[in-house]
UniProtKB/Swiss-Prot annotation:
This is ATP synthase epsilon chain, chloroplastic. GO terms for molecular function: ATP binding; proton-transporting ATP synthase activity, rotational mechanism. Produces ATP from ADP in the presence of a proton gradient across the membrane. Gene3D superfamilies: 6.10.140.480, F0F1 ATP synthase delta/epsilon subunit, N-terminal (2.60.15.10). The keyword Lyase does not apply. It comes from the Eukaryota. Pfam families: ATP-synt_DE, ATP-synt_DE_N. It comes from Ipomoea batatas. GO terms for cellular component: chloroplast thylakoid membrane; proton-transporting ATP synthase complex.
Length: 133
């Protein structure tokens, strides 16, 4: 038995196919979803989506949004998403280093919050690459 997974951003469909299982980062922690999961709606955190296709796992960096699960269908609506295999590792590492430097020199509450979000996004992209290496 499989699940129908659809990952959407405002600009494109990132994923639309059958999967065996997913592990989703939510605001209250990670949840595993198998076929016949109870219906839920949840906020999606900045983090990694792990997708199992038969014996292979695929990763995707998600940048926050919402997910709806029901009737063996999962719809994930996020601000942005990238498959781990599509992320340039050198560019992602450079972005992470810049985000870390910006976080260290952030002044004031607003700058600190914005720098922290940029840092979390950069770390997630690097983690998505490393999870498939």
């Amino acid at each position: 038995m499989t699940l129908k997974l659809c990952v959407l951003t405002p600009n494109r469909i990132v994923w639309d196919s059958e999967v065996k299982e997913i592990i989703l980062s939510t605001n209250s922690g990670q949840i595993g979803i198998l076929p016949n999961h109870a219906p839920i709606a949840t906020a999606v955190d900045i983090g990694i989506l792990r997708i199992r296709l038969n014996d292979q796992w695929v990763t995707m960096a998600l940048m926050g949004g919402f997910a709806r699960i029901g009737n063996n269908e999962i719809t994930v609506l996020v601000n942005d998403a990238e498959k781990g295999s599509d992320i340039d590792s050198l560019e992602a590492q450079q972005t992470l280093e810049i985000a870390e430097a910006n976080f260290r020199k952030a002044e004031g509450k607003r700058q600190t919050i914005e720098a922290n979000l940029a840092l979390r996004r950069a770390r997630t992209r690097v983690e998505a690459i490393n999870a498939i290496s």
